[in-house]
A protein has these predicted regions:
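Structural/interface elements that position substrates and couple domains in central-metabolism enzymes
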Residues: 1-130
Length: 130
C-alpha cells in the first residue's frame, strides 16, 4: 500500500510539473474565476509569468478591467502593466484552460454559516468547460 501511495504521489507531482512547465512556455493557460478584491490581484500576479484568463460574470466589471481599472479600487492602473491576461465574461474563453482557481465570495449569514451559492455557481461554470 505504501508503494502505491508513493507512486501516486510521484505521478501527481510529475503531472503538476508538466502543467506548470507548459504554462511557463505559454502552451497552456490558467484561469481565475471571480475577479473581486481577492481574485484580481491573484490573476494579475500569475499574468506576469504565464497566460491567464480572468473570468467574471459581471460584464461591467470586466469592461473596467480591460481598461486597467480595478472596480474594487484596490489596485492602480500600473498594476495591470506587463500582464498577459484576457479579461472575459464569456464562458467560451475558459475552454482552453488547464488550471482553474476559483476566488468568489462566500458571505456568511446571521448564524455565521457560509452562503455557498457563488461557489456552486462558479463550480458549475468550470464544469461546463471541462
Amino acid at each position: 500500500m505504501k508503494e502505491y501511495i508513493r507512486l501516486e504521489t510521484k505521478i501527481k507531482k510529475e503531472m503538476s510539473d508538466l502543467i506548470y512547465d507548459r504554462m511557463l512556455k505559454g502552451e497552456s493557460k490558467l484561469a481565475v474565476i471571480g475577479l473581486g478584491y481577492v481574485g484580481l490581484p491573484i490573476a494579475l500576479d500569475f499574468a506576469r509569468k504565464i497566460k491567464v484568463v480572468g473570468f467574471d460574470i459581471n460584464q461591467k466589471r470586466v469592461d473596467m478591467m480591460k481598461n486597467n481599472i480595478d472596480p474594487s479600487n484596490e489596485l492602480e492602473a500600473k498594476d495591470f502593466e506587463g500582464c498577459d491576461i484576457l479579461f472575459s465574461a464569456d464562458i467560451n474563453d475558459l475552454k482552453d484552460v488547464e488550471f482553474y482557481i476559483v476566488a468568489v465570495p462566500t458571505p456568511i449569514d446571521d448564524a455565521n454559516l457560509p452562503d455557498l451559492t457563488p461557489l456552486l455557481g462558479a463550480s458549475k461554470t468550470v464544469a461546463q468547460v471541462l
